[in-house]
């Protein structure tokens, strides 16, 4: 089985099947798919905005027609578990991640757009 066949099989799976697969992989290889995520502080006041913005929020405006690919991209980029990443995608429009540097935000935007989502930087 090659990589494309594996990806195709994963795309065909339901969310429940994906969750079980992740749990089985975690158990078999002794790893955790969930990475710690730092929570950004509250939004700064409007009067505190600098000339050039140094922190950006990645805003998921629309998930497009490829929901599973967008969920996978959100998981990969944020380190969230499957359930949490699905929640972020299901709650769109909304922020995926806040307080990122310009480079990190643009990289995240690019990867989410490759997955089929419409993304804005705020």
Curated annotation (Swiss-Prot):
Family per similarity comment: Belongs to the bacterial ribosomal protein bL12 family.
Stored NCBIfam families: L12
Quaternary context: Homodimer. Part of the ribosomal stalk of the 50S ribosomal subunit. Forms a multimeric L10(L12)X complex, where L10 forms an elongated spine to which 2 to 4 L12 dimers bind in a sequential fashion. Binds GTP-bound translation factors.
Keyword Hydrolase: no
GO cellular component, one term: cytosolic large ribosomal subunit
GO annotation terms (biological process): translation
UniProt-annotated stretches for the region Disordered: 94-122
Function: Forms part of the ribosomal stalk which helps the ribosome interact with GTP-bound translation factors. Is thus essential for accurate translation.
Swiss-Prot/TrEMBL keywords: Ribonucleoprotein, Ribosomal protein
Protein name, entry field: Large ribosomal subunit protein bL12
UniProt-recorded Gene Ontology molecular function terms: mRNA binding; structural constituent of ribosome
Bias (Basic and acidic residues) ranges: 99-114
One family name in Pfam for this protein: Ribosomal_L12
Species of the source: Halanaerobium praevalens
């Amino acid at each position: 089985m090659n990589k494309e066949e594996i990806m195709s099989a994963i795309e065909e799976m339901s969310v429940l099947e994906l969750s079980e697969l992740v749990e089985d992989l975690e158990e078999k290889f002794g790893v955790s798919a969930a990475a710690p995520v730092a929570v950004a502080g509250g939004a700064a006041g409007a009067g505190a905005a600098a000339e050039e913005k140094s922190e950006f929020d990645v805003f998921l405006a629309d998930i497009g027609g490829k929901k599973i690919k967008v969920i996978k991209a959100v998981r990969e980029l944020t380190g969230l578990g499957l359930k949490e990443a699905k929640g972020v995608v299901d709650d769109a429009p909304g922020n995926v991640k806040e307080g990122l540097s310009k480079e990190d935000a643009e990289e995240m935007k690019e990867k989410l757009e490759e997955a089929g989502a419409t993304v804005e930087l705020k």
